[in-house]
From Swiss-Prot:
GO terms for cellular component: cytoplasm. It comes from Cronobacter sakazakii (strain ATCC BAA-894). It comes from the Bacteria. This is Tryptophan synthase beta chain. The modification N6-(pyridoxal phosphate)lysine is found at residue 87.
Protein backbone atom coordinates (compact mmCIF):
# COMPACT_ATOMS: atom_id res chain seq x y z
CA UNK A 1 0.00 0.00 0.00
CA UNK A 2 1.42 3.41 -0.90
CA UNK A 3 1.48 5.94 1.93
CA UNK A 4 1.35 9.74 2.00
CA UNK A 5 4.14 9.98 4.57
CA UNK A 6 7.30 7.89 4.87
CA UNK A 7 6.41 4.92 7.13
CA UNK A 8 10.07 4.24 7.96
CA UNK A 9 12.84 5.82 10.03
CA UNK A 10 15.87 4.26 8.36
CA UNK A 11 15.10 0.54 8.51
CA UNK A 12 12.71 0.89 11.46
CA UNK A 13 8.94 1.32 11.49
CA UNK A 14 6.56 0.13 8.79
CA UNK A 15 3.00 -1.22 8.84
CA UNK A 16 3.15 -4.87 9.87
CA UNK A 17 -0.54 -5.42 10.53
CA UNK A 18 -3.25 -7.77 9.24
CA UNK A 19 -4.69 -6.72 5.87
CA UNK A 20 -8.00 -5.95 7.58
CA UNK A 21 -6.43 -2.96 9.38
CA UNK A 22 -4.82 -1.36 6.30
CA UNK A 23 -7.91 0.73 5.38
CA UNK A 24 -8.15 2.04 8.96
CA UNK A 25 -4.48 3.10 8.96
CA UNK A 26 -4.87 4.67 5.52
CA UNK A 27 -7.94 6.63 6.65
CA UNK A 28 -6.06 7.80 9.76
CA UNK A 29 -3.05 8.94 7.73
CA UNK A 30 -5.27 10.87 5.29
CA UNK A 31 -7.15 12.55 8.16
CA UNK A 32 -3.87 13.49 9.87
CA UNK A 33 -2.26 14.92 6.71
CA UNK A 34 -5.33 17.02 5.90
CA UNK A 35 -5.66 18.18 9.54
CA UNK A 36 -2.04 19.36 9.61
CA UNK A 37 -2.83 21.96 6.95
CA UNK A 38 -6.32 22.80 8.22
CA UNK A 39 -6.21 26.12 10.10
CA UNK A 40 -9.50 25.40 11.86
CA UNK A 41 -8.29 22.03 13.19
CA UNK A 42 -5.01 23.56 14.37
CA UNK A 43 -6.82 26.44 16.09
CA UNK A 44 -9.12 24.00 17.89
CA UNK A 45 -6.17 21.84 19.00
CA UNK A 46 -4.19 24.89 20.20
CA UNK A 47 -7.22 26.20 22.08
CA UNK A 48 -7.72 22.87 23.90
CA UNK A 49 -4.02 22.69 24.78
CA UNK A 50 -4.07 26.21 26.20
CA UNK A 51 -7.48 26.56 27.86
CA UNK A 52 -8.22 22.94 28.81
CA UNK A 53 -4.85 21.28 29.33
CA UNK A 54 -2.92 24.29 30.62
CA UNK A 55 -0.13 24.85 28.10
CA UNK A 56 2.50 26.13 27.96
CA UNK A 57 3.85 24.21 30.95
CA UNK A 58 6.52 25.81 33.14
CA UNK A 59 10.27 25.34 32.79
CA UNK A 60 11.43 25.23 36.42
CA UNK A 61 15.01 25.84 37.54
CA UNK A 62 16.09 23.51 40.35
CA UNK A 63 17.06 25.63 43.35
CA UNK A 64 18.73 23.06 45.60
CA UNK A 65 19.55 19.88 43.66
CA UNK A 66 22.59 21.35 41.96
CA UNK A 67 24.24 22.77 45.08
CA UNK A 68 27.98 22.15 45.11
CA UNK A 69 28.13 21.68 41.33
CA UNK A 70 28.35 24.00 38.31
CA UNK A 71 25.34 22.39 36.64
CA UNK A 72 22.21 24.40 35.89
CA UNK A 73 19.24 22.03 35.81
CA UNK A 74 15.76 22.79 34.53
CA UNK A 75 12.65 20.61 34.63
CA UNK A 76 10.07 20.79 31.84
CA UNK A 77 6.93 20.50 33.92
CA UNK A 78 4.62 18.15 32.00
CA UNK A 79 3.51 17.00 35.47
CA UNK A 80 1.52 20.26 35.69
CA UNK A 81 -0.59 19.41 32.66
CA UNK A 82 -4.27 18.55 33.17
CA UNK A 83 -4.39 14.78 33.60
CA UNK A 84 -1.00 14.67 35.31
CA UNK A 85 1.33 13.84 32.42
CA UNK A 86 2.40 14.61 28.85
CA UNK A 87 -0.11 12.03 27.60
CA UNK A 88 -2.87 14.67 27.50
CA UNK A 89 -1.17 16.55 24.63
CA UNK A 90 -1.48 13.95 21.96
CA UNK A 91 -4.80 12.38 23.02
CA UNK A 92 -6.50 15.73 22.47
CA UNK A 93 -5.06 15.74 18.95
CA UNK A 94 -6.08 12.13 18.30
CA UNK A 95 -9.58 12.66 19.74
CA UNK A 96 -10.07 15.59 17.36
CA UNK A 97 -8.89 13.34 14.50
CA UNK A 98 -11.39 10.66 15.59
CA UNK A 99 -14.20 13.21 15.42
CA UNK A 100 -12.91 14.37 12.03
CA UNK A 101 -13.17 10.76 10.75
CA UNK A 102 -16.71 10.41 12.10
CA UNK A 103 -15.78 7.84 14.77
CA UNK A 104 -17.94 7.56 17.90
CA UNK A 105 -15.78 5.24 20.03
CA UNK A 106 -12.24 5.28 21.39
CA UNK A 107 -10.16 2.18 22.12
CA UNK A 108 -6.98 2.66 24.14
CA UNK A 109 -4.34 0.66 25.97
CA UNK A 110 -2.58 1.84 29.12
CA UNK A 111 0.26 0.75 31.40
CA UNK A 112 0.72 3.29 34.18
CA UNK A 113 -2.83 4.45 33.60
CA UNK A 114 -1.75 7.94 32.51
CA UNK A 115 -2.66 7.36 28.87
CA UNK A 116 -5.90 5.74 30.04
CA UNK A 117 -6.76 8.80 32.13
CA UNK A 118 -5.87 11.10 29.23
CA UNK A 119 -7.98 9.04 26.80
CA UNK A 120 -10.89 9.05 29.25
CA UNK A 121 -10.78 12.81 29.79
CA UNK A 122 -10.51 13.58 26.06
CA UNK A 123 -13.39 11.18 25.32
CA UNK A 124 -15.56 12.73 28.04
CA UNK A 125 -14.79 16.22 26.75
CA UNK A 126 -15.55 15.41 23.11
CA UNK A 127 -18.48 13.05 23.64
CA UNK A 128 -16.81 9.78 22.60
CA UNK A 129 -17.46 6.35 24.12
CA UNK A 130 -14.22 5.00 25.59
CA UNK A 131 -12.92 1.52 26.46
CA UNK A 132 -9.45 0.98 27.84
CA UNK A 133 -7.42 -2.23 27.93
CA UNK A 134 -5.06 -2.56 30.87
CA UNK A 135 -2.91 -5.47 32.06
CA UNK A 136 -4.43 -7.03 35.18
CA UNK A 137 -1.11 -6.53 36.99
CA UNK A 138 -1.20 -2.81 36.15
CA UNK A 139 -4.85 -2.51 37.24
CA UNK A 140 -3.62 -3.67 40.64
CA UNK A 141 -0.60 -1.37 40.94
CA UNK A 142 -2.32 1.71 39.50
CA UNK A 143 -5.68 1.68 41.29
CA UNK A 144 -6.02 5.50 41.63
CA UNK A 145 -5.79 5.90 37.86
CA UNK A 146 -8.26 3.06 37.25
CA UNK A 147 -10.79 4.88 39.42
CA UNK A 148 -10.09 8.17 37.60
CA UNK A 149 -10.82 6.51 34.25
CA UNK A 150 -14.08 5.06 35.53
CA UNK A 151 -15.09 8.41 37.04
CA UNK A 152 -14.82 9.94 33.58
CA UNK A 153 -17.06 7.29 32.08
CA UNK A 154 -14.50 4.94 30.54
CA UNK A 155 -14.84 1.16 30.63
CA UNK A 156 -11.63 -0.42 31.95
CA UNK A 157 -11.02 -3.96 30.67
CA UNK A 158 -8.37 -5.95 32.61
CA UNK A 159 -6.19 -8.22 30.44
CA UNK A 160 -5.12 -11.47 32.09
CA UNK A 161 -3.25 -13.09 29.19
CA UNK A 162 0.55 -13.29 28.92
CA UNK A 163 2.36 -11.22 31.54
CA UNK A 164 -0.86 -9.21 32.18
CA UNK A 165 1.00 -5.93 31.51
CA UNK A 166 1.19 -3.28 28.79
CA UNK A 167 2.26 -5.50 25.88
CA UNK A 168 -0.79 -7.73 26.45
CA UNK A 169 -3.08 -4.71 26.69
CA UNK A 170 -1.66 -3.50 23.34
CA UNK A 171 -2.41 -6.87 21.72
CA UNK A 172 -6.02 -6.86 22.98
CA UNK A 173 -6.60 -3.27 21.88
CA UNK A 174 -5.38 -4.05 18.34
CA UNK A 175 -7.55 -7.17 18.26
CA UNK A 176 -10.61 -5.12 19.27
CA UNK A 177 -9.82 -2.45 16.65
CA UNK A 178 -9.59 -4.99 13.83
CA UNK A 179 -13.28 -5.77 14.41
CA UNK A 180 -14.56 -2.27 15.14
CA UNK A 181 -12.56 0.28 13.12
CA UNK A 182 -15.64 1.32 11.15
CA UNK A 183 -16.87 3.15 14.27
CA UNK A 184 -13.87 3.16 16.65
CA UNK A 185 -10.51 4.94 16.65
CA UNK A 186 -7.56 3.22 18.30
CA UNK A 187 -5.90 5.92 20.38
CA UNK A 188 -2.40 4.52 20.62
CA UNK A 189 -0.58 5.88 23.64
CA UNK A 190 3.02 6.13 22.52
CA UNK A 191 5.23 6.93 19.53
CA UNK A 192 5.35 3.28 18.49
CA UNK A 193 3.20 0.77 16.62
CA UNK A 194 2.33 0.75 12.91
CA UNK A 195 2.63 3.82 10.68
CA UNK A 196 1.25 6.50 10.90
CA UNK A 197 1.09 6.35 14.74
CA UNK A 198 4.79 7.11 15.49
CA UNK A 199 4.61 10.23 13.29
CA UNK A 200 1.21 11.38 14.57
CA UNK A 201 2.20 11.01 18.22
CA UNK A 202 5.50 12.83 17.68
CA UNK A 203 3.77 15.75 15.96
CA UNK A 204 1.12 15.96 18.70
CA UNK A 205 3.88 15.97 21.36
CA UNK A 206 6.47 18.21 19.72
CA UNK A 207 5.25 21.34 21.55
CA UNK A 208 7.21 19.99 24.57
CA UNK A 209 10.53 20.66 22.82
CA UNK A 210 9.29 23.78 21.04
CA UNK A 211 8.25 25.39 24.33
CA UNK A 212 11.47 24.25 26.02
CA UNK A 213 13.56 25.90 23.30
CA UNK A 214 11.74 29.24 23.63
CA UNK A 215 11.76 29.13 27.45
CA UNK A 216 15.45 28.22 27.84
CA UNK A 217 16.45 30.94 25.34
CA UNK A 218 14.49 33.45 27.38
CA UNK A 219 15.95 32.29 30.71
CA UNK A 220 19.54 31.44 29.75
CA UNK A 221 20.06 33.05 26.35
CA UNK A 222 21.30 29.78 24.87
CA UNK A 223 20.27 26.23 24.04
CA UNK A 224 20.85 23.45 26.62
CA UNK A 225 23.87 21.16 26.44
CA UNK A 226 21.51 18.19 26.72
CA UNK A 227 17.83 17.33 27.04
CA UNK A 228 17.04 14.15 28.96
CA UNK A 229 13.85 12.07 28.91
CA UNK A 230 12.74 8.60 29.95
CA UNK A 231 11.96 6.08 27.21
CA UNK A 232 9.35 3.33 27.33
CA UNK A 233 7.59 3.50 23.99
CA UNK A 234 9.16 6.94 23.75
CA UNK A 235 6.47 9.61 23.25
CA UNK A 236 7.58 12.11 25.89
CA UNK A 237 11.19 11.75 24.73
CA UNK A 238 10.42 12.21 21.02
CA UNK A 239 8.23 15.19 21.94
CA UNK A 240 11.22 16.74 23.70
CA UNK A 241 13.80 15.69 21.08
CA UNK A 242 11.91 16.59 17.87
CA UNK A 243 12.68 20.31 17.91
CA UNK A 244 16.35 19.74 18.78
CA UNK A 245 17.26 16.93 16.36
CA UNK A 246 18.85 19.35 13.88
CA UNK A 247 20.64 21.28 16.66
CA UNK A 248 23.76 19.13 16.85
CA UNK A 249 25.11 21.13 19.81
CA UNK A 250 22.24 19.77 21.94
CA UNK A 251 22.73 16.25 23.30
CA UNK A 252 19.64 14.03 23.20
CA UNK A 253 19.65 11.49 26.02
CA UNK A 254 16.97 8.82 26.36
CA UNK A 255 16.79 6.80 29.57
CA UNK A 256 15.50 3.22 29.49
CA UNK A 257 14.57 1.23 32.62
CA UNK A 258 17.29 -1.15 33.80
CA UNK A 259 14.82 -2.64 36.32
CA UNK A 260 16.62 -4.97 38.73
CA UNK A 261 19.80 -4.56 36.66
CA UNK A 262 20.55 -5.36 33.01
CA UNK A 263 22.55 -8.43 34.05
CA UNK A 264 19.49 -9.98 35.74
CA UNK A 265 17.48 -9.95 32.50
CA UNK A 266 14.68 -8.17 34.40
CA UNK A 267 14.62 -4.81 32.62
CA UNK A 268 12.92 -2.87 29.84
CA UNK A 269 15.89 -1.66 27.79
CA UNK A 270 15.45 -3.09 24.26
CA UNK A 271 17.36 -0.28 22.51
CA UNK A 272 20.65 -1.28 24.05
CA UNK A 273 19.92 -4.84 25.06
CA UNK A 274 17.35 -6.19 22.60
CA UNK A 275 17.33 -7.46 19.01
CA UNK A 276 15.46 -6.12 16.01
CA UNK A 277 12.21 -7.87 15.19
CA UNK A 278 8.60 -7.33 14.18
CA UNK A 279 6.13 -6.60 16.97
CA UNK A 280 3.09 -4.41 17.50
CA UNK A 281 2.91 -3.53 13.81
CA UNK A 282 6.48 -2.20 13.46
CA UNK A 283 10.08 -3.23 12.93
CA UNK A 284 12.08 -2.16 15.98
CA UNK A 285 14.45 -3.43 18.67
CA UNK A 286 12.67 -5.60 21.20
CA UNK A 287 13.29 -7.99 24.04
CA UNK A 288 13.15 -11.51 22.62
CA UNK A 289 13.89 -15.04 23.72
CA UNK A 290 16.43 -17.08 21.73
CA UNK A 291 13.60 -18.52 19.63
CA UNK A 292 12.18 -15.08 18.81
CA UNK A 293 9.28 -14.89 21.25
CA UNK A 294 8.60 -11.51 22.85
CA UNK A 295 10.16 -11.53 26.29
CA UNK A 296 8.56 -9.95 29.33
CA UNK A 297 9.99 -6.57 30.19
CA UNK A 298 10.22 -5.36 33.77
CA UNK A 299 10.32 -1.95 35.44
CA UNK A 300 9.09 -0.61 38.77
CA UNK A 301 7.36 2.02 36.66
CA UNK A 302 4.36 0.62 34.78
CA UNK A 303 4.69 3.22 32.03
CA UNK A 304 8.20 2.03 31.07
CA UNK A 305 7.36 -1.68 31.33
CA UNK A 306 7.28 -2.25 27.54
CA UNK A 307 9.39 -4.80 25.60
CA UNK A 308 9.96 -2.62 22.52
CA UNK A 309 10.49 1.03 21.61
CA UNK A 310 9.36 3.57 19.01
CA UNK A 311 11.04 3.33 15.58
CA UNK A 312 12.36 6.90 15.55
CA UNK A 313 14.29 6.24 18.75
CA UNK A 314 15.71 3.09 17.14
CA UNK A 315 16.82 5.23 14.20
CA UNK A 316 18.32 8.01 16.38
CA UNK A 317 20.20 5.31 18.30
CA UNK A 318 21.49 3.66 15.10
CA UNK A 319 22.78 6.98 13.70
CA UNK A 320 24.29 8.04 17.02
CA UNK A 321 22.30 11.31 17.06
CA UNK A 322 20.78 10.35 20.41
CA UNK A 323 22.41 8.51 23.29
CA UNK A 324 20.46 5.89 25.23
CA UNK A 325 21.36 4.83 28.75
CA UNK A 326 19.58 2.89 31.47
CA UNK A 327 18.70 3.47 35.13
CA UNK A 328 17.75 0.83 37.71
CA UNK A 329 14.67 0.81 39.94
CA UNK A 330 16.83 1.74 42.93
CA UNK A 331 18.44 4.69 41.16
CA UNK A 332 15.02 5.95 40.05
CA UNK A 333 13.64 5.61 43.59
CA UNK A 334 16.60 7.56 44.96
CA UNK A 335 15.99 10.35 42.42
CA UNK A 336 12.27 10.31 43.27
CA UNK A 337 13.07 10.82 46.94
CA UNK A 338 15.72 13.47 46.23
CA UNK A 339 13.37 15.62 44.15
CA UNK A 340 10.61 15.36 46.76
CA UNK A 341 12.95 16.33 49.61
CA UNK A 342 15.00 19.01 47.88
CA UNK A 343 12.59 20.70 45.47
CA UNK A 344 9.12 19.86 46.82
CA UNK A 345 8.07 18.14 43.58
CA UNK A 346 6.75 14.56 43.47
CA UNK A 347 7.74 13.09 40.09
CA UNK A 348 6.32 10.04 38.35
CA UNK A 349 8.57 6.98 38.63
CA UNK A 350 8.94 7.10 34.84
CA UNK A 351 10.29 10.67 34.95
CA UNK A 352 12.48 9.74 37.93
CA UNK A 353 14.57 7.60 35.57
CA UNK A 354 15.45 10.69 33.49
CA UNK A 355 16.14 12.72 36.62
CA UNK A 356 18.40 9.98 38.00
CA UNK A 357 20.58 10.14 34.91
CA UNK A 358 20.81 13.94 35.13
CA UNK A 359 21.91 13.62 38.77
CA UNK A 360 24.53 11.05 37.69
CA UNK A 361 25.89 13.44 35.05
CA UNK A 362 25.99 16.25 37.57
CA UNK A 363 27.76 14.24 40.27
CA UNK A 364 30.25 12.71 37.85
CA UNK A 365 31.53 16.16 36.88
CA UNK A 366 30.69 18.68 39.63
CA UNK A 367 33.21 21.17 38.19
CA UNK A 368 31.74 21.01 34.70
CA UNK A 369 29.60 23.95 33.66
CA UNK A 370 26.58 22.40 31.96
CA UNK A 371 22.99 23.37 31.20
CA UNK A 372 20.62 20.39 31.37
CA UNK A 373 16.87 20.01 30.87
CA UNK A 374 14.96 17.00 32.18
CA UNK A 375 11.51 16.32 30.81
CA UNK A 376 9.46 15.77 33.97
CA UNK A 377 6.89 13.82 31.98
CA UNK A 378 4.37 13.21 34.77
CA UNK A 379 3.53 13.64 38.43
CA UNK A 380 3.96 10.93 41.02
CA UNK A 381 0.54 10.84 42.71
CA UNK A 382 -0.16 7.52 40.98
CA UNK A 383 3.06 6.03 42.40
CA UNK A 384 2.85 7.04 46.05
CA UNK A 385 1.43 3.69 47.21
CA UNK A 386 4.10 1.70 45.37
CA UNK A 387 6.86 3.93 46.76
CA UNK A 388 5.32 3.95 50.25
CA UNK A 389 5.35 0.14 50.43
CA UNK A 390 8.99 -0.04 49.28
CA UNK A 391 10.23 2.66 51.66
CA UNK A 392 8.24 1.15 54.52
CA UNK A 393 9.74 -2.30 53.89
CA UNK A 394 13.21 -0.71 53.92
CA UNK A 395 12.47 1.16 57.13
CA UNK A 396 12.85 4.52 55.38
CA UNK A 397 9.42 5.86 56.34
Amino acid sequence: MSTLLNPYFGEFGGMYVPQILMPALRQLEEAFVSAQSDAEFQAQFTDLLKNYAGRPTALTKCQNLTEGTRTTLYLKREDLLHGGAHKTNQVLGQALLAKRMGKTEIIAETGAGQHGVASALASALLGLKCRIYMGAKDVERQSPNVFRMKLMGAEVIPVYSGSATLKDACNEALRDWSGSYDRAHYMLGTAAGPHPFPTIVREFQRMIGEETRAQIMEKEGRLPDAVIACVGGGSNAIGMFADFINETSVGLIGVEPAGHGIETGEHGAPLKHGRVGIYFGMKAPMMQTDDGQIEESYSISAGLDFPSVGPQHAYLNSTGRAEYVSITDDEALEAFKTLCRQEGIIPALESSHALAHALKMMRAAPEKEQLLVVNLSGRGDKDIFTVHDIFKARGEM
